[in-house]
Amino acid sequence: MEVVLNEILPSSFSCTPATDSHCMSSLFQHRDPMLKKRDDFEDILEERRNSSDLRYALKCYTPVVYKGVTPNAASLLKTTVLQSDQLHYVVDQLSKETGVAADVIQEEASAILEEMAHRQQLSTVRFFAFTLSKAFKALFRSIHVNEEGIQRLQQAIQEHPVVLLPSHRSYMDFLLMSYILYTYDLVLPVIAAGMDFMGMKFVGEMLRMSGAFFIRRSFGGDKLYWTVFSEYVKTMLRNGMAPVEFFLEGTRSRTSKSLTPKLGLLNIVMDPFFKGEVFDVSLVPVSISYERILEETLYARELLGVPKPKESTSGLFKARKVLSEDYGSIHVYFGQPVSVRSLAQGKVNRCHFNLMPRHIPRRPSDETQCFVNDSAYSLVRAQEENMVLKPWVLLASLLLQNQSQGLLLDELTEQAVWLRGLSREYGAFLNWPDHMAPSEVVSSSLSLHRDLVKISGGRVQLALGGQGLMNQAVVVLSCTSYRNQALHVFLRPALLASAIHIATSAKKEEVYNSFSFLRNMLSNEFILCPGATLQDFEEACYLLGKTGALQMSQQEMQVTDSGQKTVNFLTAMLDPFLQGYQVRHTHTHTHTHTHTTKQADTFAWSLRYYELLSSDLQKNALAALLRLGAIRKIKVYVGFLHPCVPEWNLHSHINRLINSNY
């Protein structure tokens, strides 16, 4: 079906390659997988299976520390925070504004700090080391860690304050991080945790004594809380007593897609460098890849609207049955430490921070905020690039594109081998055991995920039959969480493949404008660095051309006959998202948000297109439609109205995208 580009692209979205900028190229360049050496991995559970867990927990633990660490810094942490110039300044300001005595506000600050602060004790750490060894050996076949990354981290800890930035796909993440650092005799991190965990009797206090400090999910306009919190984190960095660990995405990803980074804590940890209080800060992105996610069913049900269960000690004990399950392997990749000093070179003028005393709070300048935002996106990209993909990720991608009939086992194996080659060409960090026959690899993966697939008459299908609509949707959304792990590998070529199809001509400028529109529309859905449209376009051209799917001249580009299979696969990867945006827009008229969501859900159920039921997809689609001006939000007495903007007519635009015969 032909699509007129001018109908799709509002004039404000039209841009040319000459006017676009690049995004933090210091962290990301075009990758040729044949030129990049991957670090070697070590299975840290292998030794645990062959030696005493008690001896491991009670081992001599003497980690190397930051060369500038202040003696007794840990014991003086609370005192240092409460006596800080910035806290005193804010207390005095609040006292003047509210008329409340400064002593009363200071006591409130002390209470906030008492509720927040960690109290790390080695005895508790040893208890966790013993307990987690038992649990991990029961749950996982192996835990692989890149040794070179550990060596780089050990060196970084001695030279500068370190901030650990793990990806966040499971509750297991922060426990796993501390377990790994203890195994390698590295300083245990101080971890930012949500208040939800503090409410767990016994367990919450145990987490506090193993290095967790607890913060509210939202501070609102609470200046005192923000000041105590920021001073607490910055004091730890200035003193260098331990690495600070937090999740850049802010919360667990229920979809296995990277989430838009939150900037609050990143602003805080960069502030001591901006103000010249430390020479540098090292940011270490960490990628944690699970072969099978412990919470896969829980996440799928949450995405379908089932309320998240409250964290509780009793719930933890009820979850003990997972210990009898096989969750495969984990890969943990510690990335290259990123120097804030190097990142900021030529991008942030630190002289501005010397124009007023350090203790006076100030809002970040536009220049600084832009730098922090770009850094955050680039760090999440670094996490994505070092995610280790398992064979099941490829199998799930293929099965989701063949939900109705499934694939014969031999055909699935053949397709998986083809997709293995394509993903490697695109630079995927793929953990495919080449010493095994492809049929064995596929059979092993299907066995591990047998709850999600069925094999009948030599045909492999998703396990959808006779389970009821809710259970069928849970299976599909569980599978999408694995497919989503590979989206960062295929996203940019997929955007280009779709752009080529919908462009009015094969001219590069027309294709670029289509690419720019699609990228802009889906920027709530994926990690797409602001201002990097041209860089992403060039990467997509490079990858499609490299695999022979794209033929380019100076002015035009076309899909080759041999590349049609690749293009079909890539466009099918984006299809569920475009379908979801279409449904969301179709059922967003002059109704409240709740009514609209119910309408969209009902329509998706009727289609049995279960991916459209994901609350994450619907939320992102609504945000994109609002941002693009396709709808507007009007606050009324109950709920929100989302009337369409007639002149935008996005419905017809997305319809054309969806209904095009890829």
Task: Describe the predicted segments one by one.
Residues 1-662:
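Membrane-interfacial terminal anchoring regions of lipid-handling membrane enzymes
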